Swiss-Prot record:
Phylogenetic placement of the source organism: Eukaryota, Metazoa, Chordata, Craniata, Vertebrata
Cellular component, GO annotation: autophagosome; Golgi apparatus; nucleus; perinuclear region of cytoplasm; recycling endosome; trans-Golgi network
GO terms of molecular function: K63-linked polyubiquitin modification-dependent protein binding; zinc ion binding
Protein name in the entry: Optineurin
Compositionally biased residues, Basic and acidic residues: 186-197, 262-274, 281-292
Length: 527
């Protein structure tokens, strides 16, 4: 059972001017009486226009940043691809140079070996060789045909070398490629001028198209130039391969000729040995010896021509290798210069295009389109409708606030009454508790006294009974006993009536069995 007082209501009592809504107390309602509806509409319109302008500016900035990022990523990817392509080409060119250098070294070694063999063959004695005239003439014809072939091949190689030198000296291909690039640059500049003179909304589209056209044309010009140079390099490589094949053929023919000469020398040595064994000599033999001497001199002359042809072939090979190296160096230099020029021009044009795009975006952000105006008008209408609905809500809220203020005034009066009733109730409750305690004490005293009285009565009865048994008659004793029994019953009824407590409400007079239920009833009845 809780006996706490209701003074908490007095302690937590609020003033009628404090917060009456559900929101936090520090957020006070705006005093809308100071603003007119026209001013509110103007403020709402200004806020809406500023919000829309900020959103458009953010969108334009995001789009511009995305476009720049995409362009930069594409440009970096293109640069990476070009670098990889040039690295692959340089590696292939280096591999080709290494292979050609190995082939040249092998050819030089073979030529040196052939020179040594030819010198050894020229040092061998051929004066004592005696061969028949028919075989000598056949060998002579074969050697002459080989010399003619070698001279023709030499002339072809010299023509190839002269053509290569002319190609190296002439810069037609590079000039053509530069002309193509300059044409593309002129077209790009014209497109940029058109973009600058074009109206505002069409500038972004024209700039993107012009940039794409210029990039495609510059890429096509660079590709055409590279394809042209690759064709020239492939033609030179084919010429080199043909020259190498011709050199191999000449080497094979020289080997065959040397083998035949060695066979003839062996035959001549064998016959000379046979003729020394036999004695006698005739005029025919003298003529044959003279013919053999002439054949030997012709063979020596042919050997000298072959060696000179070998030297000329070596010189032609060296010139070809030098020409190829010069051409490759010039090609690499031209590629590097062209790439540097195109890269620098593309960077300049990219920066100029970015500047123009920034200017266009600024101008477009300053301008407002018709669609934007329509959207703003629609939003203004919606805002006016929302303001009207909010104004109605505000009026309703004001009415409810006035009602709540009136209710608060009545609540203060009711609270004061409640405090009075509570104080009275607490005082009555304390008094009743004291009375109840006194009643309980008196009941205890009564019980003790009744017990003592019962004990005295029992003692008196016993003494009376003893006295009657001693002195009185039975009749008088029976009457006295009936009187005493009746008196004892009355005393018991009076005791029971005194022991039952009475719990009744002071306001309505309702009788209750317990003090707790009486307190609850009193609270409900009074409040």
């Amino acid at each position: 059972m809780s006996h706490q007082p209701l003074s908490c209501l007095t302690e937590k009592e609020d003033s009628p001017t404090e917060s009456t809504g559900n929101g936090p107390p520090y957020l006070a309602h705006p005093n809308l009486d100071t603003f007119t509806p026209e001013e509110l509409l103007q403020q709402m319109k200004e806020l809406l226009t500023e919000n829309h302008q900020l959103k458009e500016a953010m969108k334009l900035n995001n789009q511009a940043m995305k476009g720049r990022f995409e362009e930069l990523s594409a440009w970096t990817e293109k640069q990476k691809e070009e670098r990889q392509f040039f690295e692959i080409q340089s590696k292939e060119a280096k591999e080709r140079l290494m292979a050609l250098s190995h082939e040249n070294e092998k050819l030089k070694e073979e030529l040196g070996k052939l020179k040594g063999k030819s010198e050894r063959s020229s040092e061998d004695p051929t004066d004592d060789s005696r061969l028949p005239r028919a075989e000598a003439e056949q060998e002579k014809d074969q050697l002459r045909t080989q010399v003619v072939r070698l001279q023709a091949e030499k002339a072809d190689l010299l023509g190839i070398v002269s053509e290569l030198q002319l190609k190296l000296n002439s810069s037609g291909s590079s000039e053509d490629s530069f002309v193509e690039i300059r044409m593309a640059e002129g077209e790009a500049e014209g497109s940029v001028k058109e973009i600058k003179h074009s109206p505002g909304p069409t500038r972004t589209v024209s700039t993107s198209r012009a940039l794409s056209k210029y990039r495609s044309r510059s890429a096509e010009g660079a590709k055409n130039y590279l394809e042209h140079e690759e064709l020239t390099v492939s033609q030179l490589l084919l010429c080199l391969r043909e020259g190498n094949q011709k050199v191999e053929r000449l080497e094979i023919a020289l080997k065959e000729a040397k083998e035949r000469v060695s066979d003839f020398e062996k035959k001549a040595s064998n016959r000379s040995e046979i003729e020394t064994q036999t004695e006698g000599s005739t005029e025919k033999e003298n003529d044959e010896e003279k013919g053999l001497e002439t054949v030997g001199s012709e063979v020596e002359a042919l050997n000298l021509q072959v060696t000179s042809l070998f030297k000329e072939l070596q010189e032609a090979h060296t010139k070809l290798s030098e020409a190829e190296l010069m051409k490759k160096r010039l090609q690499e230099k031209s590629k590097l210069t062209v790439l540097q020029m195109t890269h620098n021009k593309l960077l300049r044009e990219h920066n100029n295009a970015l500047k123009t795009i920034e200017e266009l975006t600024r101008k477009e952000s300053e301008k407002v389109d018709r669609a934007v105006l329509k959207e703003l008008s629609e939003k203004l209408e919606l805002a006016e409708q929302a303001l009207a609905s909010k104004q109605l809500q505000m009026d309703e809220m004001k009415q409810t606030i006035a009602k709540q203020e009136e209710d608060l005034e009545t609540m203060t009066v009711l609270r004061a009454q409640m405090e009075v009733y509570c104080s009275d109730f607490h005082a009555e409750r304390a008094a009743r508790e004291k009375i109840h305690e006194q009643k309980e004490q008196l009941a205890l005293q009564l019980a003790v006294l009744l017990k003592e009285n019962d004990a005295f009565e029992d003692g008196g009865r016993q003494s009376l009974m003893e006295m009657q048994s001693r002195h009185g008659a039975r009749t008088s004793g029976a009457d006295q006993q009936a009187y005493l029994v009746q008196r004892g019953a009355e005393d018991r009824d009076w005791r029971q009536q005194r022991n039952i407590p009475i719990h009744s409400c002071p306001k309505c007079g309702e009788v209750l069995p317990d003090i707790d239920t009486l307190q609850i009833h009193v609270m409900d009845c009074i409040i």
